[in-house]
């Protein structure tokens, strides 16, 4: 099943519901960055969170940047996601390994709190019009879902519920994704809607299991919470959209970055190596800038 985002509304348009699957994106990041099991899960969660946030932007070129700065051994992370469904990102310590912790009923989980430590979640929304909007909140516990819910509560004052998780079998991530349920701004003072959202979300006992069983049909995942969604509130074209790991780096962007160096630095590169190799932090693609290209920069 390809990664996908699905949108719906409930309560006569008063509640917005978005579900996203990020399994393939997480595995692509694992391959490109050489991620461990825990860092694959953490980056997958950040992919889900950023795509859920970007899904509400009104223009297709709008983007959301999600950055975690913290004192944990993960050494932070950075994710860039667009309303167009493209997402990319990296973590500070891709090789991180931590022991599993027991949660309940002999079930074990990764210690996301220990991995991220204490710190801040920074969210930048860029609509491409005017200055980007930036907001920062303290990390709640590092599991990404509650950290995102805290951001929505403090920065957007929007009653929201966020569920993000993954399913792991035989040390492989077999599904990753998330779900966002929000009372829309014009309805957020309606106590009945807020209560309805709270009651429905209390019925979710294991989001990761629900995601695993509904990954081929995200609309059924949404219906697990709100069986009575507004079927005709969103057009079929707008309801479902493919998402995936996609980087916007290129050879030209690498050349432009090199041009920012002064001529002395460029001369030094030619003397020492005769060429330059630039590596994209987001996707690990490598771009070779040869002698002639660097010489042209110096002479121009």
From Swiss-Prot:
Disulfide bonds join 247-249, 280-283. GO terms for biological process: protein refolding. It comes from the Bacteria. GO terms for cellular component: cytoplasm. InterPro entries: Heat_shock_Hsp33, Heat_shock_Hsp33_C, Heat_shock_Hsp33_N. Under oxidizing conditions two disulfide bonds are formed involving the reactive cysteines. Under reducing conditions zinc is bound to the reactive cysteines and the protein is inactive. One of its GO terms (molecular function) is unfolded protein binding. CDD domains: Hsp33. Its main location: cytoplasm. It is found in: Cytoplasm. Keywords: Chaperone, Cytoplasm, Disulfide bond, Redox-active center, Zinc. Redox regulated molecular chaperone. Protects both thermally unfolding and oxidatively damaged proteins from irreversible aggregation. Plays an important role in the bacterial defense system toward oxidative stress. Belongs to the HSP33 family. PANTHER family: 33 KDA CHAPERONIN. This is 33 kDa chaperonin. It comes from Prochlorococcus marinus (strain MIT 9312). The gene is hslO.
